[in-house]
Amino acid sequence: MNKTQRNILNAAFEVLSQDFSAPLDKVADAAGVTRATLHRYYKNREVLMEATGLELVRHTHEIVDEAMTQYDNPREQLKAVIMKSASLGDRFHFLLHAMEHDNHEQHYPKFQEVEQRILGLVDAVRNKGLVNPDMPNAWIIHLYYGIMTTSWSALSEGSVAPKKVPELAWQSFSSGIFLTK
């Protein structure tokens, strides 16, 4: 992916997370390109939407890979994933909104693959006896997406300082799944 494509995708996340029905002209303007340039890479809205979903999957895999490389402890790995993901709250909000309004069934296996990687970290922490045994993995994934949506709302509204959002996301997530002593 070249710089122009990446700029267009970043602009799509930014613009469409605020107004899902915004015209592609707004995306092109935010990316600093003409609409013709946008269409050179993404022939229509559907192709652009598909590319944003795939980019979010790719980026989330990258976040998990970085956490697993950076830390040996599964709890620290999970913390790194939650905190980094929370800083991308606008992208997760965009994805959830897109999935509500469009048919993205062809991408579900890719999203499920990401979820499985996150749940792998949860299971590693669970195996250490730290996760509430009554907390099913399906609930934990819903909690994860809820935290991402809350992060986006806080970032979007400016109601919480952006630097605080990742730590608050981790506090919320960890207090929701870990056993209290």
Segment roles from a protein language model:
Residues 1-18, 22-30, 47-50:
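Basic, helix-initiating cap at the start of DNA-binding domains
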Residues 32-42:
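Short hydrophobic/aromatic patch on the recognition helix
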Residues 43-44, 54:
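Residue-level detection of the helix-turn-helix DNA-binding "recognition helix"
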Residues 51, 62-91:
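Hydrophobic alpha-helical connector segments
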Residues 76, 109, 127-143, 162-167:
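All-alpha amphipathic helical-bundle segments outside canonical DNA-binding/catalytic cores
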Residues 86-119:
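Short secondary-structure transition hinges
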Residues 116, 120-128, 153-181:
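C-terminal peripheral helix-coil segments that are non-catalytic and often amphipathic
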